[in-house]
Amino acid sequence: MPTIKQLIRNPRQPIRNVTKSPALRGCPQRRGTCTRVYTITPKKPNSALRKVARVRLTSGFEITAYIPGIGHNSQEHSVVLVRGGRVKDLPGVRYHIVRGTLDAVGVKDRQQGRSKYGVKKPK
């Protein structure tokens, strides 16, 4: 327990909270350009080819973002919107690409959970 004199000399430091998505710089989303689109394999109990993209953001960061949904049209030089949100079985992937905005089209033939994949209501 410090004395009053010690606290005057060296005040208590506030606890700084660490963000889980530092590349967004406190914004809800960021725009970026795909520099590479490829697939990676998930961690141990799971097995798949997960679609990811390397994205250079307007904040200057180069990040790896997951492309959700079945099928995509993203390629190099595609302009995409990136949100936070990690993928549990892909180490180092802490961001998601938002489908249905900018160059990333919505998922084709999606009926349920459409808002998460940028799909308009079917007629």
Curated annotation (Swiss-Prot):
Q: Which domain of life is it from?
A: Eukaryota
Q: Name one Pfam family in it.
A: Ribosom_S12_S23
Keyword hit for rRNA-binding: yes
A GO-annotated cellular component: small ribosomal subunit
| Keyword terms, alphabetized | Chloroplast, Plastid, Ribonucleoprotein, Ribosomal protein, RNA-binding, rRNA-binding
The principal location of this protein is plastid
Q: Which GO biological process annotations does it have?
A: translation
Entry GO MF terms: rRNA binding; structural constituent of ribosome
Instruction: Write down the PROSITE patterns for this protein, in alphabetical order.
Output: RIBOSOMAL_S12 (PS00055)
Instruction: State which residue ranges cross the membrane.
Output: none
How is the subunit organization of this protein annotated in UniProt?
A: Part of the 30S ribosomal subunit.
State the family it belongs to: Belongs to the universal ribosomal protein uS12 family.
Q: Please explain the role this protein plays, according to its UniProt record.
A: With S4 and S5 plays an important role in translational accuracy. Located at the interface of the 30S and 50S subunits.
Quote the protein name from its UniProt record: Small ribosomal subunit protein uS12cz/uS12cy
Species of provenance: Citrus sinensis (Sweet orange)
